[in-house]
Amino acid sequence: MRIIETVSEMQQQADDWRRAGKRIGFVPTMGYFHEGHLMLMRKVRGEADMVVASIFVNPAQFGPNEDLATYPRDLDRDLRLAGEVGVDVAFVPQVGEMYPDGYQTYVEVTKVTAPLCGRSRPLFFRGVATVVVKLFHIVKPHVAVFGEKDYQQLVTIRRMVKDLNLDIEILGHPIVREPDDLAMSSRNKYLTPEQRPLALRLSRALKAARARVALGERNGSVILKEVKELLDAGGEVRIDYAELRDPATMEEVGSMDGPSLLALAVFVGTTRLIDNCILRPAA
């Protein structure tokens, strides 16, 4: 596996591959890999001739009081794991390479970014959209894969690609879970042994909602009331949001007449965790 650190070298490699008729697959990451990341790489490996994974902790998507300084990092391990799953190039730029002195251009996707994470993290999606469109221009992929745990992010990227006429296929990959059903996340590392059981309320709340819908419940308020009661059952858990949204538009859903995104975000202690599922009412 080749390691590339500069924009110019990555662009040159991408140009060489494209001239040779190679299909480029891409997985953008912030590193500290878990099985979820590796599943994305395996998926794109089956979709492309050459695979690039980027490792870049993007400062533009962190707010002033968020965990940029403490976000977990282990580059040597990440590079080893990426090589083992068949990544051809790891693109590992420094902050100054992506945002040199004088940088002043940002990409903003409206509407789909307004609720949920966009409401509680106002700079997040501007930072995500900006870095992803930059990476697309640098890596020049034909196809890119994103995890569905960050469902609103996936919708945002698809909207951006459509609106900016980018010729890139965007694929989603289902949430990958730990054996205890906690959605895999680099931030799970922050949880203490005492907090881990509290974090499992997320997946339990999703299961309860699915069961409610399977029994015929269509009233969003009823479903959300039960979900919030399960999440807010004492201990150091604070709900950021628990909402039903249209999976394509991110508009709020009251009565479920079709598939609906149940999106959850909670703080367990100081660690913010997200999870989601698509609720599908029976016809």
Swiss-Prot record:
HAMAP family: PanC
Record's function text: Catalyzes the condensation of pantoate with beta-alanine in an ATP-dependent reaction via a pantoyl-adenylate intermediate.
Gene Ontology terms: biological process: pantothenate biosynthetic process
Residues annotated as the enzyme's active site: H37 (proton donor)
Keywords of the record: ATP-binding, Cytoplasm, Ligase, Nucleotide-binding, Pantothenate biosynthesis
Cross-referenced InterPro entries: Pantoate_ligase, Pantoate_ligase_C, Rossmann-like_a/b/a_fold
Top EC class of this enzyme: ligase
Molecular-function annotations in GO: ATP binding; pantoate-beta-alanine ligase activity
UniProt keyword annotation of DNA repair present: no
UniProt-recorded name of the protein: Pantothenate synthetase
Annotated residues for binding of ATP: 30-37, 147-150, 176, 184-187
Quaternary structure and partners: Homodimer.
Entry EC number(s): 6.3.2.1
Remaining remarks: The reaction proceeds by a bi uni uni bi ping pong mechanism.
Subcellular localization(s) per the UniProt record: Cytoplasm
Binding site for (R)-pantoate: Q61, Q153
Pathway assignment: Cofactor biosynthesis; (R)-pantothenate biosynthesis; (R)-pantothenate from (R)-pantoate and beta-alanine: step 1/1
